[in-house]
Amino acid sequence: MDIKEAYKQLNEFDILVIPGGGTDAIIKSKSEPLGLIKAFSDLQKKHPERERTVFSICTGSLLLAQAGILSGLSATTHPDFFAKMEKINGEVAMRDLAERCDVVEERYVVNNLRFDLGNPEENPYVRRKSDARRPSMGRKGSNAWKESNTRRESNARRASLRLGGLRVITSGGITCGLDASLYLVSIMVSEEAATEVTRLMQYTWNKGIVVDGIDI
């Protein structure tokens, strides 16, 4: 599918995946997929009742940062590009008069989850990392509260979140994208399905963090 066709079908997409590679040229020329990323996030702000996810792998997060998607959120990227991401975040914050992104060193980072976390002191899955590149608060995994399956989603709550509740997932280096993909399988299908995928792949799922909420 080319970019022109992607724009035509954008309203039908549930997940937009942004891989890394070639980011310097894209940012310098302000070319695609920067416009596509922005258009996808604008769709969510206009129609927050729909559940959508933007998911970057490796240096793809630099493109999300350049598009202004990560302002005020937490995110990660390939560790060799932390300094570059900080630089982009600073430039974008000045350009858009927006908050900076909090860059943390994790396998993956998930923002704008479906349900409120509640009191983090009562949840053993919330942790404060003192050894991260920056201190970060997040919960390992995606299944801390099974009772959240009974919660009713609120469109009003989703609309009040940044980007209209667009779920934003950034992952580190290439294999971190596998871990983040397993997270997506767990929330969109089931934890059991994600576990079965790891069995078939003979892969150990290394979980990242989720920020200020839960998905299941």
Q: PLM ranges: what are they?
A:
Residues 9-216:
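Active-site-adjacent pocket-lining segments in enzyme domains
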Residues 1-3:
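Short gly/ser/thr-rich secondary-structure transition/capping motifs
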